[in-house]
Amino acid sequence: MNTTTRTRMRPEERRQQILNVALELFAKRGFEEVTIGDIAAEMDIVRPTIYIYFPSTNAILDAIFENLLESYWQKLEPLIKSAGDIVPNPQLVSKAFRIMHSEPYLLSILRCGGPSFQKKRHAQFNKKLRALLEPYTNSDIPYISPIIGLLIEGLAYWAIQENIQDTEELANALEQFVSHGLDKR
């Protein structure tokens, strides 16, 4: 017999608790290895409680992605707006890399859930990045926004996977790379 006292939560608190627990489980085991039952067991609740909020683990993953992406944009948007009309700006790119590198869960979520989910999430990410960058871009380089976005995301993911300790050195190298590329136009 379970003697644990359950705590009643407001719906938004319960929803957020589900997202937090699911994120931790996805990070530990990988998205494909986590079920609604696993999340419920970790929370000591019954599965139907989770189904009140989310119809599937894919829906949970999408909600987590939205939250993480919003957090990233809230950190990135002021940097872009303060850069004025000098985007692409090498310093801005290295700052965006630092922010992305500090969001390992976002990077993991971008790469899990199968090809169709990855494509959908990358499309969301790139659409938002283009919307943020294009008003400030006076570049004659075609596709500059997705190039910068993929460079930042890919390098941040690689640095985490390879356990690169000196991210400042990597950010500076990225800044030099972008600066060199812009000087050659």
Task: Enumerate the language-model features and the residues they cover.
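Amphipathic alpha-helical segments used for helix-helix packing
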Residues: P88-N126, Y157-Q161
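Basic, helix-initiating cap at the start of DNA-binding domains
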Residues: M1-R29, E33-I45, A59
